Amino acid sequence: MAKPVSETAVPLIRPEAAVARPKRAIPWEFWLLLPAVIYIFLLIGFPLILSIYYSLSHISVGRRDFSFAGLANFRAILHDGIFLQALRNTVLITIAVLVIVLILATILATILAARFRGRAVVRYLLLLPWAAPVVMSTIAWKWIFDSQYSVINWVLRQLHIIGPYEFPQWLGVPKLAIISIIMVQVWRILPFATVITLAGVNAVPKELLEAALVDGAGFFTRLFQITLPMIRPIIGVAVLFTALFTFTDMAVVWILTRGGPYNSSHVLASWAFQVGIVAGDLAQGAAIALFMLPVLAAVAVWVLRLASREVTE
């Protein structure tokens, strides 16, 4: 006997049930990245937001005035002669260090890429300035620049470049103080730039250089027409980090000269520390520090885009 139609009919499926899909769980990559994101935010993001907030207020150490000041702090520092001097010093020191470091790093990388006895020892000695703490090495340089017991003065006196009773004040004359800061920055950053450039030089195919050598290409032809064009993206990375390290460094200037004599050797980082922490004007100190942000961001974007274009081509 056949069943009634009502008992054999196929049950209706609701449209919501037909389109419903199982909920997608949070990907495991998210949980792996979360600690790093939180760490970076607490270390960089939160101080940056706090600096922006301070720079737009009237806050200082002795007065908790969080009232909105607009761009008054930025307008005030643009009319400050010491700030403009610090800005000129920062740009001058960064460009000088960049040029000297790139030239010396290319020469050292070319030498260290060749095989010779004692190459490992030379590479080890080259890395020592980078491994040493910046504060301790800068204190040692301060002794080297001492007006009476300076090793540099002794060498210059032995070479008869200066007289027996001349004592150049390396840290007491504005121009000599800037030269001293440049020397220490070059000594500090050169190992890092050399290692990066050396990695690029070693990555150049040996067959290409040997073919050029067979064709009669000399050393400088191979260097300027093969090696340097091929490692241009890596040189871009060295340029970026050298500029960032020099532009944002405060320790070398503060230990050597503390911005002296007469505030003539300040850079933006040391002047921001002087105004914001030593003098207690947190608002203007934050404004000076934030002045570096757009410059560094523009340099970083330009270098990274240049390097990316070179790799793509």
Can you say where each PLM-predicted feature lies in the sequence?
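A structural signal for multi-pass alpha-helical bundles of membrane permease subunits
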Residues: 25-313
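Short, Lys/Arg-rich, polar N-terminal cytosolic tail immediately upstream
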Residues: 1-25
